[in-house]
From Swiss-Prot:
GTP binds at residues 10-12, 22, 75, 104. It is found in: Cytoplasm. Its cofactor is Mg(2+). Mg(2+) binds at residue 104. Keywords: Cytoplasm, GTP-binding, Magnesium, Metal-binding, Molybdenum cofactor biosynthesis, Nucleotide-binding, Transferase. CDD domains: MobA (cd02503). InterPro entries: MobA-like_NTP_Trfase, Molybde_CF_guanTrfase, Nucleotide-diphossugar_trans. This is Probable molybdenum cofactor guanylyltransferase. Coiled coil: none annotated.
């Protein structure tokens, strides 16, 4: 049975600026990884979390799996960026659409995600293979977005060619549906990610 929507949480970054093991850094009493996981769980969206190889120890893995009972995967090849994480997620779960979220955005909320998902019917009519929030200045949020399973063959080809692994390059083949970022959240705070120890402390 094919699920309509599944989630992919990208947790493959090294997180060197935050001291490593970024998904399990504590922010306001919760691991960073718990924020997107809690939202997906609350919406009953099945999801997979993709980690970098050797990035978490067995105790962390066990604790996370016990809490969320989700699937986990690891980057098949290191150093390929978020495209590899999306590829791994799409291979693990059988869904028509995938909502891709980063592990380091603690301000994500349920309403914003529901608004993003509400655009699927428009994308289906227009043959868009992805739905991407876009800011007024043209900046896009490709890691807080939806990708259709039909994009998997394109993604496979790009990774196999290994010439341009930019996510913008990938999106250029997908006839993207751009939606206004402020329509998801007027403050745009949901897109703020935590990259350093200072940001971890300042934002508490």
């Amino acid at each position: 049975m094919v699920t309509i929507i599944a989630g992919i949480i990208l947790s493959g970054g090294k997180g060197e600026r935050i001291g490593g093991k970024k998904p399990f850094r504590v922010f306001n009493g919760k691991y960073l990884i718990n924020y997107p996981s809690d939202i997906l769980k609350s919406l009953n969206i099945p999801f997979v979390t993709v980690f970098a190889k050797n990035s978490i120890d067995l105790e962390m893995e066990k604790e996370y799996l016990t809490k969320y009972k989700c699937l986990i995967s690891f980057d098949l090849i290191e150093g390929k960026g978020p495209l590899m994480g999306i590829l791994c997620g799409m291979r693990v779960l059988n869904a028509k659409w995938f909502v891709v979220l980063p592990c380091d955005c603690p301000y994500i909320n349920k309403e914003a995600l529901k608004k993003l998902i509400s655009n699927i019917s428009i994308a289906e009519k227009n043959n868009n293979l992805c739905i991407i929030p876009k800011h007024e200045n043209g900046y896009i949020e490709p890691l807080f977005a939806l990708y259709k399973r039909d994009a998997l063959s394109i993604l496979n080809k790009i990774i196999m060619e290994d010439k341009n692994l930019s996510i913008r390059y990938f999106i250029s083949y997908l006839n993207p549906l751009y939606i206004k970022a402020e329509e998801l959240d007027e403050s745009k705070r949901i897109f703020k990610n935590i990259n350093t120890i200072e940001e971890l402390m300042d934002n508490e």
